[in-house]
């Protein structure tokens, strides 16, 4: 059953038969921007109980979490769910705090971890990190935009410890060099 709600110029579609895990897997593994927007609306719908929601309803909930994590929401801007807006502003520190928070919430962490691309195995990391210590030891989401390249997630060190990390490269002229740098950082941390 599919229902839709229209608020202002934002429209979100809810498929009540699609699990959050299925949407999250598609969103994270393949960097599916449409599912990112849909999940943002689903967050708003779940938090408000409203049938008609806009992306703003989900953004309000994210801003509440930013405050709970000890950050000032005024320092950040979220304009969409997929990260393609020029008006988004997040920091690596905030992303790491989100990841640490998710780790502390068993059910959330299990869903998130399962959905993240795995270095050298699948999703947007399928062709990265092969033949290195990062192979199969990095579960992370890639992100790219004009002159920006990012990688954030979890990596498993040699001693078995999980580490939350976020790397953002700005003013990038070569996305390939930025990705190589990120992969090398992961290798170095894993090797410690």
Question: Where are these predicted regions, by residue range?
Answer:
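Conserved catalytic neighborhood of penicillin-recognizing serine enzymes
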Residues: 10-40
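Single conserved hydrophobic/aromatic residue that forms the stacking wall/gate
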Residues: 1-8, 12-13
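Small-residue-rich helix-loop
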Residues: 30, 37-192
């Amino acid at each position: 059953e599919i229902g839709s709600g229209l608020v202002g110029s934002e429209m979100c579609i809810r498929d009540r038969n699609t699990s959050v895990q299925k949407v999250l897997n598609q969103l994270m593994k393949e960097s599916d921007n449409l599912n990112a927007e849909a999940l943002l609306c689903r967050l708003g719908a779940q938090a408000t109980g409203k049938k008609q929601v806009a992306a703003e309803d989900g953004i309000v909930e994210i801003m509440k979490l930013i405050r709970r994590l000890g950050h000032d929401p005024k320092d950040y801007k979220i304009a969409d769910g997929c990260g393609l807006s020029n008006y988004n502003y997040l920091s690596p520190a905030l992303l790491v705090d989100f990841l640490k928070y998710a780790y502390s919430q068993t059910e959330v962490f299990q869903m998130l971890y399962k959905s993240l691309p795995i270095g050298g195995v699948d999703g947007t990391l399928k062709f990265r990190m092969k033949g290195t210590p990062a192979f199969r030891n990095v579960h992370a989401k890639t992100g790219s935009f004009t002159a920006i390249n990012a990688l954030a997630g979890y990596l498993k060190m040699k001693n078995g410890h999980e580490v939350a990390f976020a790397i953002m490269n700005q003013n990038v002229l070569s996305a390939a060099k930025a990705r190589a740098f990120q992969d090398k950082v992961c290798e170095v941390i894993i090797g410690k």
